[in-house]
């Protein structure tokens, strides 16, 4: 049985992704912060996890190593958006966002790297807000979130380069505007998310199980610009 680690698996895209992998016969190690993972399945192992806390990251990574001798996939889904309406860069919020969306991802991933073998897949959930090739930004909001996702994109490329010789595939994936708690933060009466978590989960599963090209940024099943 193949094993996947999914962070932030108690709601939204993470929950839908956990359900998708379980339905396909995978064992899922899912992490949650506060709310439990409301799935009844013998192949789900739920672990409480705080991605902003180095001690929690160290503890959870060791627990995962006790559970699994190898990993077939890691879905770095957990993240925060706390400056959606801010049009200035608040240093406190930027620092907090980087701790969760970048440092936490790097810390957990690096600790788990020994468990990955040829054809295993690491997926970093990203966003169009992390794209730096746009000639002009849409607006000045969410600076911390944008910065964090741009940094995560570079980590994705850097990691892909480092582990390519081991046959490990590393990808970034932007799920689009999804109907989740985070996605609805910026929704209005006239503009709302146009995708459901299950659609994003299908994209993630297809990426993990079919794509062999490493170091790419994916959106809606196609490669996109960094």
Language-model features: locations:
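Conserved glycine-rich Rossmann-like NAD(P)H-binding loop of the short-chain dehydrogenase/reductase
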Residues: 24-38
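Active-site Tyr-X3-Lys motif and surrounding loop/helix of classical short-chain dehydrogenase/reductase
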Residues: 59-63, 85, 92-99
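Rossmann-fold cofactor-recognition segment
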Residues: 42-55
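N-terminal Rossmann NAD(P)H-binding glycine-rich loop of SDR-like oxidoreductase domains
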Residues: 10, 14-19
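C-terminal helical subdomain
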Residues: 165, 172, 187-226
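Conserved NAD(P)H cofactor-binding loop of Rossmann-fold oxidoreductase domains
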Residues: 77-83
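Catalytic loop of short-chain dehydrogenase/reductase
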Residues: 87-91, 95, 118-165
